[in-house]
From Swiss-Prot:
<feature type="coiled-coil region">
    <location>
        <begin position="189"/>
        <end position="324"/>
    </location>
</feature>
<feature type="region of interest" description="Disordered">
    <location>
        <begin position="596"/>
        <end position="661"/>
    </location>
</feature>
<keyword id="KW-0175">Coiled coil</keyword>
<feature type="coiled-coil region">
    <location>
        <begin position="660"/>
        <end position="740"/>
    </location>
</feature>
<feature type="coiled-coil region">
    <location>
        <begin position="366"/>
        <end position="438"/>
    </location>
</feature>
<feature type="coiled-coil region">
    <location>
        <begin position="554"/>
        <end position="589"/>
    </location>
</feature>
<feature type="region of interest" description="Disordered">
    <location>
        <begin position="678"/>
        <end position="715"/>
    </location>
</feature>
<protein>
    <recommendedName>
        <fullName>Coiled-coil domain-containing protein 191</fullName>
    </recommendedName>
</protein>
<dbReference type="InterPro" id="IPR052270">
    <property type="entry name" value="CACF_protein"/>
</dbReference>
């Protein structure tokens, strides 16, 4: 049973002895320490000193008595803690200065060796924190010895690894051979380093988790503390409020007590005065009894007279009060009747006004309904008219579109017929040309010369007339290939660029030639030649005014159509003139190209044999799609040349030198012509580009003009809509003003001719009724009030007699009650006086007793103070006797510290602690301990 309190006391002693650790140790987060880190060595020194001190105190704790150490732990002051902190800070600064100087010297000398020793330093980092795991001093010493051995072994291994065993020359020879099949050996330190890294990461993760948990706990604790503070503040506030209320209640009670005391004092004074008066009356009563008999009769007479006088005064007063009461009653009755009549008049006028208001509202609703019917009828008529016009416009638009489509369809049919006819003529011409070429290739040209000549003439007759008249019927497209008549003669399509330009320009030419049936048939084509885009454009342009015409008159619409058609005719005339110019340019270009082609064929025919010339001439003849009048002579010349060559093949085989010179001159002339043709061609191309640019500008201008017209139309439409809206607003405003004027007119009529005379009549009737009512009231008063007055006088006399009798009875009762009250009050005063006297007596005895007790307690306190001083002296002497043992323990501690310093010096050879600082630290510790023991 006695062991538990002893264990508890020992644990308290230990906590008290180790309290200085909590004050001196500064919390800091654990970092990964390196072997060259200053903080690492400082921590190790601190840990060693802590272990030494704790071990020393724990071993000697059982020998020391309980009470002095309890006093030491309990009486520790803030001054001792501050002294210890200052000493500790000075020691730490000394260690930091020494380590900084040492590290600077080592870093200046060993900059190159740092890169080599990174692996070994990394492996030592996780081991730096291992000393924190040990809780006992012996385990820590063992750990330090093992660490020292491991560092020496590691240094020896590094020395052996970096030692040069072989000369440099031998290493060079060996290196040449070993470089071929050299393999890197695995270093076990890398695996160890990885393991250390993993351990370090795990430790950091655990530290982070612990830090997070600690933060959460602190947050919870802070929240709990805040809640507690709020609760305490609320409790304090409530306590203060309750205290204030109690104080106010106390003040009120004090006030009430003072008031009660003052009242009692006044009552007492009154009683005293009454007693004095009664005593005086009792003294004078004996004298009055003698004269009482003489004055009784006189007093009775006086009393009788006084009573009569009082009765008269009472009667007069009662009469006055009755008169006033009657006046009040009659005035209230008259006022009530007047109010009732006024209410009836108001109700009548209100009912009449409501009837008139109903009539006016009904009349207004009727007029509004009539007006709405008229407006709806007009609106329906407008809508019918607008729908009729819209239907007519839509029908007219549909007919116009159908007519336009029908005319377009007719144009398209005519164009298709012309295309078919042209295709048939082309087929016939091709067949004839094929027959001619076959005959020429088979040598039957002489037999069928006349037919061969007639065939080209027919072809030229078919194709030529439109060209002579300055117009072109149609040109075959580029993808049409002529049929192959034979394998010797290949018919190629016309040239891509020139024929394409020519075809494009010729297709845009309007065909109009009076006098020829063919041209009459071709005259149907012009609307279709500009392309489907123009037709679509015209249809869309026609459709726009038709859509707009729904909102305008037909006459204006027709005028606009006529103006637009005139503009379109002018534009078409301009396009026709431009197309004619383009056609002339194309014809000139084609003629130049054809001439250059003929000269090329002639030069080739002169330079090459007959077998190669014939197909090319055939090909050139076929490739010329449209024959101009200037090229007929060249064709006849080419035919004559062909026939002459067939007749005289021997001469061609052996040409004369003159002929050669002529051929050369012809070639030169052809070259010059070709150069001129190219120049002309370039000029024509430039002109064509200019014309195209002008055409594009013209189209842009037309598009801009069209956009401007559309914008103008939109603006006109918008203005018309604005005007219509303004007109509608004006109409609505006029309607509103008319309605307001009508209402004002009706109100004026009602006020001037209806309400005001009716009000005058009502006022006159009210005045007459009031006069009649007043006259009738006066008559009733005269008739009934006299009888009522007599009855009231009789009842009043009877009541006065009863009242006098009742008054005398009440007076008797009051006198008796007051005498009884007076007796009870006297008894109460006597009782209170007795109680007060007893209280004074008791309080006086209690005061004497308290004074005696105070004197006794003061003497006892002085005795206790002397006893406590004696006990303190005894305790101090006893602790002084134990001081010898304490000094022995301090010496043992100092020896332990010396051992630790030696170990630190072994770890750090250059470390030296100044003796003065160490002695000062020791003296401060001993001084603080002795001071606490003395206290």
């Amino acid at each position: 049973m006695l062991m538990a309190p002893q264990g508890r006391s020992s644990s308290k002693k230990r906590m008290g002895l180790n309290r200085w650790k909590r004050f001196t140790r500064k919390p800091s987060p654990q970092h990964a320490f390196g072997p060259d880190n200053v903080e690492h060595w400082i921590k190790r020194v601190e840990k060693a000193s802590e272990f030494a001190v704790s071990n020393a105190f724990f071993t000697r704790n059982s020998d020391l008595p309980r009470s002095p150490w309890g006093q030491i732990t309990d009486w520790k002051t803030s001054e001792q803690i501050e002294d210890h902190d200052e000493i500790y800070a000075e020691a730490q600064e000394l260690v930091n200065d020494w380590l900084d100087s040492k590290l600077k010297q080592e870093l200046a000398s060993d900059e190159e060796g740092d890169a080599k020793n990174t692996v070994s330093s990394v492996s030592l980092v996780p081991e730096a924190n291992d000393h924190l795991k040990y809780d006992k001093f012996d385990d820590l010493c063992g750990y330090l010895e093992e660490e020292e051995e491991s560092t020496t072994v590691q240094k020896f291994i590094d020395h052996l690894l970096h030692k040069n065993v072989v000369d440099s020359a031998v290493m060079e020879d060996l290196g040449r051979k070993e470089n071929q099949d050299k393999k890197q050996q695995k270093d076990p330190r890398l695996t160890m380093e990885m393991r250390h890294k993993q351990v370090k990461e795990n430790r950091l993760r655990r530290e982070k988790e612990l830090e997070y948990q600690r933060i959460q706990k602190t947050l919870k604790k802070s929240a709990f503390l805040e809640a507690q503070c709020l609760v305490q503040e609320e409790k304090k506030r409530k306590a203060l409020e309750a205290k204030k209320e109690e104080e106010e209640i106390q003040r009120e009670m004090v006030k009430l007590r003072r008031e009660i005391i003052e009242r009692r004092r006044t009552v007492k004074e009154a009683w005293k005065i009454e007693k004095k008066r009664q005593e005086e009356n009792s003294q004078n009563s004996s004298e009055k009894l003698m004269f009482q008999s003489t004055h009784i009769l006189l007093d009775e007479e006086k009393m009788a007279k006084e009573r009569k006088r009082k009765l008269k005064e009472l009667l007069i007063q009662i009469f006055k009060e009755n008169q006033q009461c009657q006046k009040r009653y009659f005035s209230a009755w008259h006022k009530l009747i007047l109010d009732h009549r006024i209410k009836l008049g108001k109700a009548g006028t209100l009912s009449d006004w409501k009837i008139q208001l109903k009539v006016l509202r009904a009349w207004r609703d009727y007029t509004r309904s009539q007006k709405l019917q008229r407006e709806t009828q007009a609106l329906e008529n407008d809508l019918r008219e607008e729908n009729r016009k819209q239907q007519l416009a839509a029908e007219h638009n549909r007919k116009q579109v159908l007519r336009h489509c029908f005319t377009e369809w007719q144009h398209w049919c005519g164009a298709e017929l012309l295309k078919r006819e042209l295709a048939l003529t082309k087929e016939e011409n091709r067949k004839k040309m094929d027959a001619l070429l076959k005959a020429a290739s088979l040598g039957k040209l002489s037999a069928s010369e006349s037919s061969g000549i007639s065939l080209p003439e027919e072809a030229t007759a078919v194709v030529g007339p439109p060209v002579r008249n300055g117009q072109v019927t149609a040109v075959p497209p580029l993808w049409e290939k002529p049929p192959l008549g034979s394998s010797d003669c290949m018919l190629s399509p016309p040239l891509g660029r020139t024929t394409g330009n020519l075809q494009g320009s010729l297709q845009n030419v309007p065909l109009s030639a009076p006098g020829n049936k063919q041209h009459k048939t071709l005259g149907v084509e012009p609307p279709q030649l500009p392309g489907s885009n123009e037709t679509l454009r015209t249809t869309s342009q026609k459709a726009e005014p038709l859509c707009l015409g729904h909102f305008h008159s037909r006459h204006v619409f027709q005028q606009q159509l006529i103006e637009k058609q005139k503009k379109k005719l002018q534009e078409q005339q301009k396009t026709i003139l431009e197309l004619k110019k383009n056609q002339r340019l194309a014809e000139a270009q084609w003629a130049a190209e054809h001439a250059s082609a003929v000269t090329d064929t002639q030069s080739h025919l002169l330079s090459k044999p007959r077998g190669e010339e014939e197909p090319r001439t055939c090909q050139m003849l076929v490739n010329s799609p449209v024959a101009s009048p200037g090229t007929e002579g060249s064709r006849s010349d080419s035919r004559n040349c062909l026939s002459g060559r067939k007749r005289k093949p021997k001469q061609l085989m052996t040409p004369h030198p003159i002929l050669k010179a002529m051929e050369e001159r012809a070639i030169q002339r052809a070259e010059r012509r070709r150069i001129l043709a190219e120049k002309k061609k370039k000029q024509e191309e430039e002109k064509l580009a200019q014309l195209k640019a002008q055409e594009e500008e013209r189209q842009k201008r037309e598009a801009e003009e069209k956009e401007a017209q559309l914008e103008r139309k939109r603006e006109e439409k918008r203005l018309k809509k604005m005007k219509e809206l303004e007109k509608q607003k004006r109409i609505k405003r006029n309607q509103q003003l008319e309605a307001i004027a009508k209402e004002h007119y009706e109100g004026v009529l009602l006020r001037k001719k209806g309400l005001e005379p009716w009000k005058i009549l009502r006022m006159q009737s009210k005045q007459n009724v009031q006069v009649a009512e007043e006259h009738y009231c006066l008559f009733l008063q005269r008739k009934y009030l006299l009888t009522w007055f007599q009855c009231s006088q009789e009842s009043l006399a009877r009541k006065m007699a009863q009242a006098d009798q009742f008054y005398s009875q009440i007076l008797l009762k009051r006198v008796i009650r007051s005498w009884l009250q007076y007796m009870t009050d006297l008894q109460e005063e006597v009782r209170k006086f007795c109680v007060r006297f007893l209280q004074k007596k008791i309080f006086r005895a209690w005061f004497n007793m308290v004074r005696e007790v105070k004197i006794d307690s003061r003497g006892k306190h002085e005795i206790a103070a002397e006893h406590s001083d004696r006990r303190i002296l005894w305790i101090t002497f006893r602790t002084w006797k134990k001081f010898v043992k304490f000094m022995k323990e301090e010496r043992v501690k100092e020896e332990r510290r010396q051992q630790l310093r030696r170990k630190v010096v072994e770890i750090l050879p250059d470390f030296q602690v100044p003796g003065s600082d160490h002695e000062l630290y020791q003296q401060s510790d001993t001084w603080s301990l002795s001071k606490t023991s003395l206290l």
